[in-house]
């Protein structure tokens, strides 16, 4: 007795998944050359950022990490976001690039939250001298917003 059953397969999703898994990309978060200059023409955002990220003890400038520490503090949330992004995009065309782009954007959001919250409460308060020098502002690292706007993410080919 002949059968009218026809078996077909669509491996496009599987093939795209395989392609995405082989893609070697990396999401980078920081201050890059294109966003490095400042309106006042003084130190670059990268120079100012490095001074605050690591501190300059010889000048009495405490460490106020806006990159490494906030990402570490919010690591669990970032990993949860990454997991959701991976599940939603891994089998899609262009999915690998989208995954890394969205993870980078999530990192940017964490950094911006750190600027708004004083490093999630970890940054040392400004001294009275510094507050007076700034005309009474006690806000940390956000007077001109140039440094925080310079922090971006980008996706590059990995090794």
For each predicted feature, which ranges?
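Short, Lys/Arg-rich flexible segments
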Residues: 1-159
């Amino acid at each position: 007795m002949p059968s009218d059953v026809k078996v077909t397969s669509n491996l496009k999703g599987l093939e795209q998944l395989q392609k995405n898994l082989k893609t070697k990309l990396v999401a980078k978060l920081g201050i890059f050359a294109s966003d490095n200059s400042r309106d006042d023409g003084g130190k670059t955002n990268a120079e100012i950022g490095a001074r605050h990220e690591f501190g300059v003890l010889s000048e009495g400038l405490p460490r106020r990490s806006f990159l490494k520490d906030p990402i570490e503090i919010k690591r669990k949330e970032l990993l949860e976001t990454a997991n959701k992004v991976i599940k939603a995009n891994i089998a899609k065309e262009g999915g690998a690039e989208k995954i890394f782009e969205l993870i980078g954007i999530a990192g940017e959001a964490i950094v911006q939250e750190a600027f708004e919250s004083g490093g999630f409460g970890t940054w040392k308060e400004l001294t009275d001298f510094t507050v007076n020098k700034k005309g009474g502002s006690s806000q940390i690292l956000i007077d001109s917003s140039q440094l925080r706007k310079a922090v971006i993410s980008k996706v590059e080919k990995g090794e």
